[in-house]
Amino acid sequence: MTVDNLQERTGAVTFKGQPITLLGPEPRIGDPAPEFSLTTGDLSNVTREILLDEGRRAALLIAVPSLDTPVCSLESQKFNQRLGEIPGDVAVAVVSMDLPFAQARWCAAQGDVKLQMLSDYRDHSFGLNYGLMIRELGFLARAVIIVAKDGTISYVEIVPEIAAEPDYDRALQAAAAVA
């Protein structure tokens, strides 16, 4: 991971009460959603254009540090259970630094998972371009980002404490609004 010339934001989030540093620009509502290349369970790449189906659908991107932690697992389960609250065509993806094989194991253990699992392990483009890469830990910060069909960011929640959960109701309402 190359981190030269990246913006650093210290104190935007904490880990167990201690300030940590996020790398990359802060995502802002109304800005064009940055590009990314993420890896699926079959090791193929998914880009922003593919996820948005070239402007035919919006995307709800759920960034978690690791599915192997209780809070990340619970968060992913809750979003999976509440997918029906989003009308229309919205791609819903959990993005983590976990290897695709670990993501597949998590899905197998859960059973009926409708979320798309995407890994940022290869080049960290999602974490760095969306300002969610934690310098000290090499994980993604916990965040929910919604990209509208036109490719702009329409919702951002970067959870202030890594061990806390996001606001599910607000995120799902925002996703429904862009569906």
Give the location of each predicted region.
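Chalcogenol-based redox active-site neighborhoods
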Residues: 1-179
